[in-house]
Amino acid sequence: MNMFSKVFGTRSQREVKRIMPLVKKIEDLRPEMQKLTDEELRGKTREFKKRLEEGATLDDLLPEAFATVREAAKRVLGMEHFEVQLIGGIVLHQGRIAEMKTGEGKTLVATLPSYLNALEGKGVHVVTVNDYLAKRDADEMGQVHRFLGLTVGVVLNDMKPEERREAYNCDITYVTNNELGFDYLRDNMVIYKEQLVQRDLHYCIIDEVDSILIDEARTPLIISGQSGKSTKLYEVCDILAQQLERGEASHEMTKIAAIMGEEVIETGDFVVNEKDKIVNLTEQGVKKVEKFFSIENLADPENLEIQHNIILALRAHNLMHRDQDYVVKDDEVMIVDEFTGRIMPGRRYSDGLHQAIEAKEHVKVKRESKTLATITFQNFFNKYDKKGGMTGTALTEEKEFRDIYAMDVVEIPTNKPVQRKDLDDAVYMTKKEKFNAVVQSVKEAHEKQQPVLVGTITIENSELISRMLKREGIPHNVLNAKFHELEAEIVAQAGQAGAVTIATNMAGRGTDIKLDDVSRAAGGLKIIGTERHESRRIDNQLRGRSGRQGDPGESRFYISLEDDLMRLFGSERLMKVFTSLGVAENEQIEHKMLSNAIEKAQEKIEFNNFGIRKNLLDYDQVNNEQREIIYKERRQVLDGENMRDAIYKMITDIVDNAVDMCFSEDVDSEEWDLNEFNSVLRQIIPIEPLTAEKVKGKKKNEMKHLIKEEAVKLYEAKESEFPEPEQLRELERVILLKSIDSKWMDHIDDMEILRQGIGLTAYGQRDPVVEYKMAAFDMFNSMITSIQEDTVRMLYHVHVEQKIEREQVAKVTGTNKDDSSVRKPVQRKEIKVYPNDPCPCGSGKKYKQCCGRKTANV
């Protein structure tokens, strides 16, 4: 703590001091609230809404509204908010993050700002990390809101769109971050306004805010459909990958190294950078790939797919580990969530990595998915007018919260002082010695009936410790990837006397571990970490499971110099130091140098991960601006707006572009290339061909005016073919919607390919993000032009008797973060399928070439 903090207190302490007068006002209202009958207390909601209509602000209502919720919670749940919980509620209402230690009642805190902000009638979202917590909190805390006359909904993974719509229309909705994000994306893929499920994003309270906005922010949300590409190349590249030899690089090729002209000396066929999770082919490796595929130059654009797939195969073999990153179950590769250690059914790695792993594991390779819609959590949550967050650990990432989300962190004091003892790390030379020490420590605690929670990073380690404990005859529970409903129950029982629980990472987070009298007397819950995590914050989360509400407890991490964290950040040097000191087997090492090395390694990885998230955001910021434009245009079409003027604008833009491309002011009209102009424009707008007589003596602008007049008259003639003008208006909406969706989905894929290839510009001393922005701008403009041309072309060639109905452009097959496969938005029933439509079976072929042919042959 620096001198300023010692004299004036930390920033959090100063913020809490500022909030205290408000807390006193709430406390002073307590006797008044206690006198009210249930009916009078409920009537406060109507009173507050009326005052808002009359011009009062939420801040004006805060003391009384909070006092109302406090009294309601006491009557309904038998729980009254502590002073520190009132402080937390105020911080959340202000759109900040309240750091509250485990067991301080964060769930109850959320009832205060959610009630106050729900009074505006725009909806409040309380966001949690899993369905179990969303349902539990909606059931328990929802009682308080219902008592006060508000409606409460919950959105769960298996709900149908109509159930979701009903839940989102409630005053307060409990929902997971994944469901919330995917519903937003799905809403921007629906074909009828009535299919929308969400309202505008007004205010949200994010529980476990660090987990959602930081840990999960490295991967964007992706909704995917099936691509038509063959899977053969994955299997071929897998065979080649196993023949290539792994080498080493003399040093990393950084941007600075490239600028300075430093040469990187590489051995073998490929090198692996485990820190950044990157694989690169060496010059020798490139030659082997070219020879294997009988191609001249791997870098040629037509060989991009081979290059991409061989890198994927090498990543699958060298960076993706079975029983750590994924498991193979029932002939299927299933992802393991790196933050909870749970299997995620229905979730697949995108961009072909999942297929590469399937080829590696010799299971059936499924077709690659095509991205239909995507968004990062950073950009999604920044769409809210206001957001607040709660967690037990946020201060270490305060800079990121402030820079990316414009949220600052306020540390809320605990209701009772923390009694937990956090012991120094126990460090051993090898993993074997470390695990022996862990088992010995569990054994000692178990003998005196002290409950133990052992935290592991991988499934493999949890199963290893389980086997070792079985050999010692110590009964225990294991919580890893096999998610089941009993998980929360097992975690809740982890504080009972003699209980031993092994949990992968933070399974069961959000569930309180309560002690009984025997375990309290034995020293409280003992936390054993079997490895330091990449992030100090996640280590602190594990520690925070013990010592809730002033309970006793202790925590200690057991580390070996063979652990991944140490191995990646130079433990060879430390290994040599301690070998020379002659450390005996099973002897614990204690040295200042070790503590520093561990902290430095974590800081490096945290900085690295921040870089990954920042990089993702820099690129997605470009996508976000484009996404906003497309989604706004789409919503106008869905809202049933009259698109006639927009279509006329498209027609005139197309004429302008064609004239500008083919005619020049600098040459006489006799020299204009009329053939080129006719072929460019007439395939879109079927005007009469331009002849030399028509253009003779005319200026370029004159021609623009004449052609526009003719094009507009032609469109008016098309309008007159329809008995009802609204028929053509609906056709305009249908065709425009189809064109937007089709082009936007292709554009998402093109942008991803661009992003992957743009990194090479760093070697040319150019900023990749700037290059990406420039290229993305050009690509977006091309896409807009393409949408306009497609729409106008179809409208000029449509016939009155043609029946064109709205339909989804692509079939949704899954998402990358859902707990199960994704639901397709409800479609109108009995949609007629026409010969040139995509076949409903999802084959990607036209109906007439697929099921339509079978039907015709019957």
Name what the model sees in each region.
Residues 91, 839-840:
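Short alpha-helical segment immediately N-terminal to, or the first helix within
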Residues 10, 842-844, 853-854:
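Small disulfide-bonded, cysteine-rich extracellular recognition modules and tandem repeats
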Residues 326-334, 340-347, 549-550, 557, ...:
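Extended, charged helical/alpha-beta scaffold domains that provide interaction surfaces
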Residues 834-837, 843-846:
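Short metal-coordination and nucleic-acid-contact micro-motifs, chiefly zinc-binding Cys/His arrays
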Residues 449-462, 639-641, 692-696, 840:
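Short, Lys/Glu-rich amphipathic helical modules
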Residues 1-582, 631-632, 653:
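Conserved P-loop NTPase motor core
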Residues 454, 502, 744, 780, ...:
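Hydrophobic, well-ordered secondary-structure elements that form the walls
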